[in-house]
């Protein structure tokens, strides 16, 4: 049995659209920009282990484990660098796999044009690290002992919407993308 099927017994979350104007049945995809599809695809497949398909001349779709995809669009020099808070999470099965991925990111930094590799940390209930790829997209390689998506929604709101966001405490805002 694959790790995906082992961890995610039921991958369907019923849409809660009774009170909404739009009545979606699924959140299907996201997008990110890249300088070069060819170079980015090499990183996605060889380093991150993502499945890629070139469905359009300026774009590829990438996925891993779930039927949710990211559209990577080649925009050349028009890439808009993003902050680490705008990142894509990739889950691995153990803390040791996080450590191995971190070591590999440092080892193959030049081969895959990885711009930054931040230290491994224990934060927000996960053991993880962030890295900035060749296109200024950020990735979090993480281990969580369970299925985080399910747990977050099962636990429900921990704070009232009247509670302040405490934006000044977000240390991630101090992390700068590379030039």
Segments predicted by a language model, with ranges:
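Short glycine-enriched loop/turn motifs at secondary-structure junctions
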Residues: 23-26, 81-85, 122-123
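Vicinal oxygen chelate
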Residues: 35-38, 89-138, 146, 166-179
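N-terminal beta-strand motif that seeds the catalytic metal site of vicinal oxygen chelate
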Residues: 2-38, 88, 148-179
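Conserved short beta-strand elements that form part of the metal-binding/catalytic scaffold
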Residues: 5-16, 51-86, 92, 131, ...
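Amphipathic alpha-helical segments
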Residues: 35-51
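Short glycine-aromatic motifs
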Residues: 24-25, 50, 111-114
């Amino acid at each position: 049995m694959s790790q995906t099927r082992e961890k995610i017994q039921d991958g369907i979350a019923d849409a809660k659209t009774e009170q909404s104007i739009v009545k979606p049945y699924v959140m299907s995809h996201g997008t990110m920009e890249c300088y070069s599809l060819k170079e980015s695809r090499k990183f996605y497949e060889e380093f991150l282990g993502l499945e890629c398909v070139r469905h359009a001349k300026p774009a590829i779709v990438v996925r891993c484990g779930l039927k949710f995809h990211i559209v990577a669009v080649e925009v050349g020099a028009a890439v808009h660098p993003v902050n680490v808070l705008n990142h894509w999470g990739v889950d691995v099965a153990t803390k040791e796999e996080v450590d191995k991925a971190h070591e590999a990111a440092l080892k193959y930094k030049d081969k895959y044009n990885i711009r930054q590799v931040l230290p491994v940390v224990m934060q927000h209930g996960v053991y993880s690290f962030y890295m900035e790829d060749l296109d200024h997209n950020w990735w979090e390689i993480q281990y969580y002992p369970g299925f985080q998506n399910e747990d977050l929604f099962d636990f429900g709101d921990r704070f009232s919407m009247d509670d302040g966001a405490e934006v000044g405490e977000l240390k991630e805002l101090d992390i700068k993308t590379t030039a």
